[in-house]
């Protein structure tokens, strides 16, 4: 499921993905016990970059998710929303959730508009920095319900999320297929109401292990 989250939507104009701004993980999670989140971004190029950031709420982070209205104008705040990032420099962007304290999980797309800068005019009277290349990057912010209810069911190598918050699930142990080698590992995000079957790890083997993360709490399942 992780690969189906709305991943980096990189719409490039004159830059390659390797040159674009490094914004860290594609999916970020704000757990129920926290109302703040920090993301470190890095400019690994040799030129300064102008970064503008905004958020939009999504009906779902999966393919087909639509942009929907916020419950309130200041539902999620961020700072700074615009910055100049020198070459080889990094900075921290902070997000603050101010929305309803209910039992709903919420999803947001963080849109990073990244422009490279160059000195286009140089003389004693006039010097200006002009954007020469740009990239639009989309990542996902998941805000867990303030009234969280973690629940799941496991049977025959399949996990079902019966709670109201996304789980990070994993399995590791002997591979189900000899062609995959001896040891395999699987990691997925499992949204509320969804099920996932492990297809590479032999979870029926006594050495096969299944576990999950409920927020920051690690929970062995099998």
UniProtKB/Swiss-Prot annotation:
This is Probable fimbrial chaperone EcpB. Gene3D superfamilies: Immunoglobulins. Part of the ecpRABCDE operon, which encodes the E.coli common pilus (ECP). ECP plays a dual role in early-stage biofilm development and host cell recognition. It holds the Pfam family EcpB_C. SUPFAM superfamilies: PapD-like. The lineage of its organism: Bacteria, Pseudomonadati, Pseudomonadota, Gammaproteobacteria, Enterobacterales. The keyword Nuclease does not apply. The gene is ecpB. Residues 1-20 form the signal peptide. InterPro entries: EcpB_C (IPR040695), Ig-like_fold (IPR013783), PapD-like_sf (IPR008962). Keywords: Chaperone, Fimbrium biogenesis, Signal. Belongs to the EcpB/EcpE family. Induction: Positively regulated by EcpR.
């Amino acid at each position: 499921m992780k690969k189906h989250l709305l991943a980096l939507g990189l719409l490039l104009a004159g830059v390659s993905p390797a040159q674009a701004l490094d914004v860290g993980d594609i999916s970020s999670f704000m757990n129920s016990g926290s109302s703040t989140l920090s993301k470190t971004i890095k400019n690994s190029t040799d030129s300064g970059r102008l970064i503008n950031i905004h958020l939009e709420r999504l009906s779902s982070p999966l393919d087909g998710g639509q942009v929907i209205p916020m419950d309130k104008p200041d539902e999620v705040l961020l700072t700074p929303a615009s910055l100049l990032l020198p070459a080889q420099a990094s900075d921290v962007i902070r997000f603050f959730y101010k929305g309803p304290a209910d039992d709903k999980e919420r999803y947001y797309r963080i849109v990073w508009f990244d422009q490279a800068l160059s000195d286009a005019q140089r003389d004693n009277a006039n010097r200006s920095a002009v954007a020469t290349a740009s990239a639009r990057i989309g990542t996902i912010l998941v805000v867990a319900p303030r009234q969280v209810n973690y629940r799941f069911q496991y049977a025959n190598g399949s996990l079902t999320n019966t709670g109201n918050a996304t789980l990070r699930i994993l399995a590791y142990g002997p591979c189900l297929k000899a062609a995959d080698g001896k040891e395999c590992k699987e990691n997925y995000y499992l949204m509320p109401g969804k099920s996932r079957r492990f297809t590479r790890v032999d979870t029926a083997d006594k050495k096969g292990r299944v576990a999950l993360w409920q927020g920051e709490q690690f929970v062995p399942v099998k």
